Amino acid sequence: HFPSGYKQALITDIVKKPGLDATDAGSYRPISNLSVVSKLLERLIVRQLMDYLSDNDLLPPLQSGFRAGHSTETAVLRVLSDILQAVDRGDVAALVLLDLSAAFDTVDHDILLQRLKLSFGVQGAAHSWFKSYLTGRTQVVRRGVLRSSVCRLLCGVPQGSVLGPILFVLYTADILSLVEDGGLLPHMYADDTQVYGSCPPTAAKELSQKLSDCVNAVASWMTSNRLQLNANKTEVLWCATGRRQYQLPTDPLPVAGAPVLPVTSVCDLGICVDGDLVMRTHVQRTVSRCFAALRQLRQIRRCVTADTLRTLVVSLVLSRLDYGNSVLVGLPAYLTVRLQSVLNASARLICNLRRYDSVTDALAGLHWLRVRERVQYKIAVLTYKSLHGVAPHYLGPMLRVADQPGRQALRSSGTNRLVAPSVRLATVGSRTFAAAGPTVWNSLPEAVTSAGTLATFRRHLKTHLFAKSFPA
């Protein structure tokens, strides 16, 4: 059994963001604090559970949440690559982002335990342990010096726990197959669900109806499983090239009884996607947030050491600049210039240069790759991981090794050239991972691609790209 002393949570609150009404309860986010010892115990269980699920191929393949080697970026990369590939064929595509209300808090314990037993083979003592883990939990809310009475928790996976998110992933695994049965493509990251599909422009209304039927089926499944789809926050985005924008539907999509109007852009797991797939909104938001952080850092520049300032810039600015940049391959030059301006301003701040001073020597001294090479670096690393089986399973099949018999086909004992698929539009099809991965990989020398470990590959790759950016 799970020790009862580890089942009590202490709930505190923090303001969601500055400027919200402090008297409104909706302005606060509850934070669940659990025993540190209980989290250590949960880590051991998670390790055993994940090993069991992996060894028996039971993990949902298109669920990227809480899995090693998976991330929000790889999830969006897969979805956006599929959409770009469809648009490159001349089709139009639609992406629906589903939003759940308090998803982790409404999980039904009986349904979860039944699913663990029937769908994932968790039986006997292990099943009894999970039942003990989920039931008999309590929480106390603390606000300042005040404390509430003890409240029993009758549903939901434990917030703030290590095991809870994994259990939620297993609880919602059927959503993926439900979407696929509806003839559409799904992808999930925890409770963030993406449903998408494509069709010829003349069949857009049929695709819209298929999306509506599928999403309503998902909403019905959620209701029967004690989850609630938030139709007011569900978004629909139609994607096509600029010339086909006029062919996109403008009618609302009926979702759970509420009409959802198509939007011109959506924020998918922190990456903004526009209907024309040019990524203007994402670049604009990234540049705006990075410069806001730089303005704040400029105010404290004289109060910190150069090393501290560099650490802050890397943590608060470059992390934003690099997030999601695997989907920025093939950007129009003017958008790349805007992103590069952030990198240049960061280097000027650290090196105390004036606004119009040359930044080339500063970038070289900091050993920073330019934006274009940073994108190539990310693509190359994901390609290496895919070829060596440490990337998400849904990325590997997008790459194809050149079929050239004999040892002459090998660039080295472990590195083959990759085949880039033919594309119709260079500004669309060449931006998919299936095309960008081989293009970047085949441009690298054998000394880089033949690296035996990921760490060695990263080191050699950066050295190679740095030499290209700043030739001696």
Name each region found by the language model:
Residues K7-T12, K17-A472:
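Hydrophobic/basic alpha-helical segments
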Residues H1-S4:
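Short, low-complexity, charged/polar segments at coil/turn and helix-coil boundaries
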